[in-house]
Amino acid sequence: MNKSKLLILKNELSSYNVSVYNRIAEEYDLTVGFFSDKSKENCYFKKMLFDIKRIGPFVFVQRLFRIVRGYDLVCFVPDLHIISYCMLPFLPRKFKLLNWSIGFRVSYVHPYLTGRKHVFLDWVFQRVLSRCDASIFYMERAKDFWQNTSLNLNRVFVAPNTTSVVPIGFDEKRKKNFLFVGTLYKGKGLNLLLKAYKEAIDIAQIDNELHIVGDGEEYQNIIAFVKDNQLEGKVVLHGAIFDEIELAKHFADALLCISPTQGGLSVPKSMGYGVPFVTKSSAITGGEIFHITPGDNGILYDEDKELSGILVDACRNPKKYLAMGRKAKQYYDDNATIDHMAKGAIAAFDFALNH
């Protein structure tokens, strides 16, 4: 039986997308179109690199309207800057059309607040979504933004935004370190983490090491902080690690994974490795922090001053956080694996194809 032809339109093909697309390719004849390729893994689907033209902040994909005619389904990221993608719902078509995204406009200016006031661009975004045969959101919570609007939520599916992990077991004796994983830039609140860690040492003489995995603009500032505060041997910088097996070793040694002001894909990654994630309740997110049930499988805190107390408590009561880690792992296995993400998307594709 021939598979239906599916084209997924992205800005960038990232490494974390590959495993879910490989899973989707088992059900559909999948092509992924993009204008930037950051993938390194084996791709069991077709790839298509687009020619683009940029005019200011806007992107136009060359010959896109001709390309899409050869597919049964087309699924695009509804980024309003990519004019060619967002024009698709308003053109005559024979193929079924879907969108796949956070679910509403989120940025540093518009954080993940489902109760915020709608503005003109939200109306434009809604028009784009409403003209599609189905929508795929990263998290169930995003539907709340569209309550009491004309968007048909019966045509909205959820594919929990997540990332893959490798099996590492759960050895309580190894789990002692505090861990940060991600790009080192100011938006992550690394300065707040370092300050809280220093305060925790001053308060309780904790001996848990802080391991930082990543690279970026804050790298030299972190080195300077470590030197100025005599934290050599306590704060360990590893640089960027792209090998998942090597990264997994750091999670295997971690009691907590912490990112004060941003909670993205590191949240399900950490949970998948059985490590509670710690971040502010107001952290910048694509919705991933809503995987966390505060105090059960992770920690959400409100004030910066609380973080040092959390680190001290983890040092003094590690069993409490080990139990959280086990619950985090169970949550990931039950709700947030790559297979859950793929099944959510496939359900949307099947629905669109048959309605």
How does the language model describe each region?
Residues S19, K176, T183-I201, E217-I223:
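A conserved mid-protein helix/loop that constitutes part of the nucleotide-sugar donor-binding site
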Residues R316-D350:
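A charged, aromatic-enriched C-terminal amphipathic alpha-helix characteristic of glycosyltransferases
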Residues N221-I241, G295:
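Nucleotide-activated donor-binding/catalytic signature segment of Leloir-type glycosyltransferases, i.e.
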Residues A240, K280, P294-K305, V312-K319:
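Conserved acidic donor-binding segment of nucleotide-sugar-dependent glycosyltransferases
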Residues K249-Q262, V275-P276:
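Acidic donor-binding loop of glycosyltransferase active sites
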Residues R105-R127, V165:
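Nucleotide-sugar donor phosphate/pyrophosphate-binding loop at the beta->alpha transition
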Residues P276-I284:
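Short hydrophobic beta-strand element within catalytic cores of glycosyltransferases
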Residues F125-G169:
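Donor nucleotide-sugar binding/catalytic pocket of nucleotide-sugar-dependent glycosyltransferases
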